[in-house]
Swiss-Prot record:
Domain of life: Eukaryota
Keyword Ion transport (UniProt): yes
Lineage: Eukaryota, Metazoa, Chordata, Craniata, Vertebrata
Effect of residue 352 to Q: In RNA edited version
Complex formation: Homotetramer, and heterotetramer with either GRIK4 or GRIK5. Can form functional heteromeric receptors with GRIK2. Interacts with PRKCABP. Interacts with NETO2.
Protein known as: Glutamate receptor ionotropic, kainate 3
Keyword Chloroplast in record: no
Gene that produces this protein: GRIK3
Note, other: The postsynaptic actions of Glu are mediated by a variety of receptors that are named according to their selective agonists. This receptor binds domoate > kainate >> L-glutamate = quisqualate >> AMPA = NMDA.
Length: 919
């Protein structure tokens, strides 16, 4: 019996122990009321916001029901609620409703959302120390001493910083900020102060007050080409703006809209998915969490069973941010109340000003709470009660709908996901199946009308280099296009008022998506439009008519050496001859015995008289012998150096003479831009409003400034297009400044034109796109691909290679005409005439001396001499009677200039060395 008894005693002990545990548990459970009451004050309206107000009230009930069904959160406790409705901005009614709820013993009051009503309720809650839960943004002054509130809406200082980080990531340099009411300027302070710290230009605009029609403002922004716009407005206004922007043609890929509302995901964006517009927003609802997705799905099922929605632009059954925040707020209050045992709630009277004794303790529990709710991580600032730590999803509109492309948090900043990294969150993904408008201008060989016997339409009307380039780009990127000629036929330039024309204007006005033409990439144009990488490099040069060949002169044989060289050669000849004469007189080795057969001869002679010295130099220069040979070392040095000098001169002359006489020289009056600037006889200019004109207009180089002053002073210097300039260059004394590629094409087909000089500058042709176009990078990549495949070079060879000008005849083997070497015959004739004149002089002089010596008349002597000279067969004639030879001092002195006596001898010479004395 002992064992059964012990077993019975054990069972009794367990029974009493269980009763004891229950006795201790019952007081704790009784410390928490069986019913917890919360209060909600919501505005109601009859307009488009009525559905939103109903959604907030529904979210309040929805969250309470979820908590009551989840018995693990509040065991043995039922969460009840009291809902009061007030009119918008009726703060008196809000105060009365709040006092009514406090009299019921609520532990917290949720709402209202409007500013004046919120302030009224917050004052009462702060006085009676009852937590006030706020769900909308509210401006809290720095001196605000109210502490009994928390706000689940993200702090707008942090949200403004998120917008600024996104703007910096997108590399915006200018943007327009559009706000709904004056509080928007407060909310966006961080962004508005950005220009003082960052290189961003902001334009601030306000939406119309008391009107949903934003079309006048949109029209003004469209006219001002404001493509990057930040809208700070409600989701209702955002839906209206998108609809009106669509009607005004602003929902294109060139516009980028950022909406600050956290309900962008709740809007019906189906009509805009394929528009190409860049639409970016923020979302705090954590849809990536499976638990959140389940709650949102349950919410949608209940909302879809309600009455059909009005035309507010919202998706059916979507849970908006306010509803999600309210859901999280109710859960936070419930969790905090569970963690605050032994807390009782009393009925509070507003007129008694007696605070809830557990209010401060409960408020601290709420501010210290950390909760992972529908809107992500919830943490409050313990001092301000604001939600400063949260995660924001960056969402962007794609063809498949809104997609998450990044995350922002106050701690980590902006983090763009790998899918979108490197291309911005809202760039159009592909050009496939897109139809683009292409503007161009007629310019050979880039764009030309196709010659055909039949009528052509559309893109088939055109051909040329740019047309082939456009076809290749369309093949690579998969887009279709429509070619349109620019209305004014101009490339694009700014006037004095800063207004653009031509293709640039059409890109600015978004009348075209691409400008495919020989459009030069310039600094000024880059400020108005975007360019792809250049598909062709070039420079400015001069187109001028080909100069005619110069008429050869009869003295063309003098051309191989310049006049300066001829003068220097003449001076060298005279100088060397004189120096040779002087040195030969001083050198003893140049004197020789003229009569070596006579040992007693005392006279020596010197061959290098002044005339002989000149004759020696002339013979060497003409490469002919003079029969005068220097004997002394000094004179031989002079002779050798002179021979070397004449060798180089004659060889150079001979080599250059062939080129000058056999090749026709083409002399142009200008050889460079400097030559143009220095003269005014030849008129010069460029295409009006073209890149070349802009280059000279903006240039700071003195030569180009001088040229622009000339062109601007003469309106006729600027031509309308290249065709007009080419015709003027052919028919008038006119030089056209244009791109080297066009000059190359023109000179291949017109042999009367040529390029003068080299390139004045270096630049490139690029494909133009509107500013901020998503197509630019894709076009650039395709151009680089064509360049690597050598297709750009092949296309250029196709369109630039012409029949070409006929090759000039080979002048090396051509016969020389009299017009080139006739001067040689003139020199020969002149030499003959001169020799005849000298011979006549010698003849007359000699006969006069003979007549005097023979004592005959001069005429008879001349007649006899002429008669003898005309007798060509006779080679011998009688020598005149020799004079009597005498030795005199006069004779000796007469020969001392060329002869000198041998030292130590008497002054006696052979009879043959003595000068004759004529009586």
């Amino acid at each position: 019996m002992t064992a059964p008894w012990r077993r019975l005693r054990s069972l009794v002990w367990e029974y009493w122990a269980g009763l004891l545990v229950c006795a201790f548990w019952i007081p704790d459970s009784r410390g928490m009321p069986h019913v917890i009451r919360i209060g909600g004050i919501f505005e109601y309206a009859d307009g488009p916001n009525a559905q939103v107000m109903n959604a907030e009230e529904h979210a309040f009930r929805f969250s309470a029901n979820i908590i009551n069904r989840n018995r693990t959160l509040l065991p043995n406790t039922t969460l009840t609620y009291d809902i009061q409705r007030i009119h918008f901005h009726d703060s008196f009614e809000a105060t009365k409703k709040a006092c009514d709820q406090l009299a019921l013993g609520v532990v917290a009051i949720f709402g209202p959302s409007q500013g004046s009503c919120t302030n009224a309720v917050q004052s009462i809650c702060n006085a009676l120390e009852v937590p006030h839960i706020q769900l909308r943004w509210k401006h809290h002054p720095l001196d605000n001493k109210d502490t009994f509130y928390v706000n689940l809406y993200p702090d707008y200082a942090s949200l403004s910083h998120a917008i600024l980080d996104l703007v910096q990531y997108l590399k915006w340099r200018s943007a327009t900020v559009v706000y709904d009411d004056s509080t928007g300027l407060i909310r966006l302070q961080e962004l508005i102060m950005a220009p003082s710290r960052y290189n961003i230009r902001l334009k601030i605009r306000q939406l119309p007050i008391d009107s949903d029609d934003s079309r006048p403002l949109l029209k003004e922004m469209k006219r001002g080409r404001e493509f990057r716009i930040i809208f700070d407005c409600s989701h209702t206004m955002a839906a209206q703006i998108l609809k009106q922007a669509m009607a005004m043609g602003m929902m294109t890929e060139y516009y980028h809209f950022i909406f600050t509302t956290l309900d962008l995901y709740a809007l019906d964006l189906e009509p805009y998915r394929y528009s190409g517009v860049n639409l970016t927003g923020f979302r705090i609802l954590n849809v990536d969490n499976p638990h959140v997705s389940a709650i949102v799905e349950k919410w949608s099922m209940e909302r879809l069973q309600a009455a059909p929605r009005s035309e507010s632009g919202l998706l059916d059954g979507v849970m908006m941010t306010d509803a999600a925040l309210l859901y999280d707020a109710v859960h936070i209050v419930s969790v905090c109340y569970q963690r605050a045992p032994q807390m009782t709630v009393n009925s509070l009277q507003c007129h008694r000003h007696k605070a809830w004794r557990f209010g401060g303790r409960f408020m601290n529990f709420i501010k210290e709470a950390q909760w992972e709710g529908l809107t992500g991580r919830i943490v409050f600032n313990k001092t301000s009660g604001l939600r400063t730590d949260f995660d924001l999803d960056i969402i962007s509109l794609k063809e498949d709908g809104l997609e998450k492309v990044g995350v922002w948090s106050p701690a980590d900043g902006l983090n763009i996901t790998e899918v979108a990294k490197g291309r911005g969150p809202n760039v159009t993904d592909s050009l496939t199946n897109r139809s683009l408008i292409v503007t161009t201008v007629l310019e050979e060989p880039f764009v030309m009308f196709r010659k055909s016997d039949r009528t052509l339409y559309g893109n088939d009307r055109f051909e040329g280099y740019c047309i082939d380039l456009l076809k290749e780009l369309a093949h690579i990127l998969g887009f279709s296009y429509e070619i349109r000629l620019v209305e004014d036929g101009k490339y694009g330039a700014q006037d004095d008022k800063g207004q653009w024309n031509g293709m640039v204007k059409e890109l600015i006005d978004h009348k075209a998506d691409l400008a495919v033409a020989p459009l030069t990439i310039t600094h000024v144009r880059e400020k108005a439009i975007d360019f792809s990488k250049p598909f062709m490099t070039l420079g400015v040069s001069i187109l001028y008519r080909k100069p005619n060949g110069t008429n050869p002169s009869v003295f063309s044989f003098l051309n191989p050496l310049s006049p300066d060289i001829w003068m220097y050669v003449l001076l060298a000849y005279l100088g060397v001859s004189c120096v040779l004469f002087v040195i030969a007189r001083f050198s003893p080795y140049e004197w020789y015995d003229a009569h070596p057969c006579n040992p007693g001869s005392e006279v020596v002679e010197n061959n290098f008289t002044l005339l002989n010295s000149f004759w020696f130099g002339m013979g060497s220069l003409m490469q002919q012998g003079s029969e005068l040979m220097p004997k002394a070392l000094s004179t031989r040095i002079i002779g050798g150096i002179w021979w070397f000098f004449t060798l180089i001169i004659i060889s150079s002359y001979t080599a250059n003479l062939a080129a000058f006489l056999t090749v026709e020289r083409m002399e142009s009056p200008i050889d460079s831009a400097d030559d143009l600037a220095k003269q005014t006889k030849i008129e010069y200019g460029a295409v009006k409003d073209g890149a070349t004109m802009t280059f000279f207009k903006k240039s700071k180089i003195s030569t180009f400034e001088k040229m622009w002053a000339f062109m601007s002073s003469k309106p006729s210097a600027l031509v309308k297009n290249n065709e007009e300039g080419i015709q003027r260059a052919l028919t008038a004394d006119y030089a056209l400044l244009m791109e080297s590629t066009t000059i190359e094409y023109v000179t291949q087909r017109n042999c009367n034109l040529t390029q003068i000089g080299g390139l004045i500058d270096s630049k490139g042709y690029g494909i133009g796109t509107p500013m901020g176009s998503p197509y630019r990078d894709k076009i650039t990549i395709a151009i680089l691909q064509l360049q690597e495949e050598d297709k750009l070079h092949i296309m250029k060879e196709k369109w630039w290679r012409g029949s070409g000008c006929p090759e000039e005849e080979n002048k090396e083997a051509s016969a020389l005409g009299i017009q080139k070497i006739g001067g040689i015959f003139i020199v020969l004739a002149a030499g003959l005439v001169l020799s005849v004149l000298v011979a006549v002089g010698e003849f007359v002089y000699k006969l006069r001396k003979t007549a005097e010596r023979e004592q005959r008349s001069f005429c008879s002597t001349v007649a006899d001499e002429i008669r003898f000279s005309l007798t060509c067969q006779r080679r011998v004639k009688h020598k005149p009677q020799p004079p009597m030879m005498v030795k005199t001092d006069a004779v000796i002195n007469m020969h001392t200039f060329n002869d000198r006596r041998l030292p130590g001898k008497d002054s006696m010479a052979c009879s043959t060395s003595l000068a004759p004395v004529f009586p």
